[in-house]
Amino acid sequence: MKYTIISGPTAVGKTDLIIEISTKIGAQIISLDSRQIYKLMDIGTAKPTKEEQQKVKHHLIDHIYPDEYYNAFYFRQDALKLRKQLTKKGIIPLFVGGTGLYIDALVKGFFEGAPKDENIRKHLNKLEKKEPGTLRTMLQKYDPEYALKIHPSDMKRTIRALEVFFKTGKKISELQSQTKISNKYKIIVLTRNRQELYERINTRVEKMIKAGLIDEVEKLLELYPKDINAFQTIGYKELIHYFENKYDLKTAIHLIKRNTRHFARRQLIWLRRYKNAIWINLSEISRRETIEKIEKIINEV
């Protein structure tokens, strides 16, 4: 059996399409969104509404609290467990979302790399103990791409990446990128013409503000410190800076729109790496044709 991943840039219009398709075929959704995973962060992450979630069961949405640590490795474990449970019940799991690291975790897994070297590990631990932050700086120097992927305080993965580098002379990010994509998955990428996508992003940000995003951020700041990883999410970090009087509300909204457009562009660049992905331009075909095309791909053996 082949499983279907449906991805695309933020604001492309995945949610309502997938709700309709899932309702028709009796599927359940496993989210591929690293921000919708947080509880209490609803408006700024564009979570499916309660009504939409009642129509179709969603998994890995509202999964953890904003101050809890989670990464792509944990996601893969949770997603594979859910996939197995749903398949066993005869339910089609649809993987839906635009977080590239989660898609990679699902279709590639994780590079195991060179065997452990206790001498290197002891030396690295000694360096970190002597001067905290040293290993993070080393990783940023030797493998900046991987440093961006992991949490700054994830010492286990930092040490592993440096260990692989010193053992093999190769970056763990490069070795991971060479990992073959599993043939168990079909990837569909939804896209739109650039100007239309950017207009949709701008409109959605305006709707988020009207829906109460400012109040949502204010309430979250009463519960959690401003520097947690979850608050690096676009829409939250800009409004936190607004509350700190770094700029006015008009500037904050402008930055949310701009940063979201930049994010959408990065998502599209990432998705182009999947050479066998099937691209569907929603600007060029009707909704009915889109639904029929996606259903056909899902049903193909």
Curated annotation (Swiss-Prot):
Keywords: ATP-binding, Magnesium, Nucleotide-binding, Transferase, tRNA processing. One of its GO terms (biological process) is tRNA modification. InterPro entries: Dimethylallyltransferase, IPT, P-loop_NTPase. It holds the Pfam family IPPT. The record marks T99 as: Interaction with substrate tRNA. Substrate binds at T10, A11, V12, G13, K14, T15. Disulfide bonds: none annotated. Its cofactor is Mg(2+). One of its GO terms (molecular function) is tRNA dimethylallyltransferase activity. Residues 33-36 are annotated as: Interaction with substrate tRNA. Belongs to the IPP transferase family. Catalyzes the transfer of a dimethylallyl group onto the adenine at position 37 in tRNAs that read codons beginning with uridine, leading to the formation of N6-(dimethylallyl)adenosine (i(6)A). Monomer. HAMAP family: IPP_trans. This is tRNA dimethylallyltransferase.
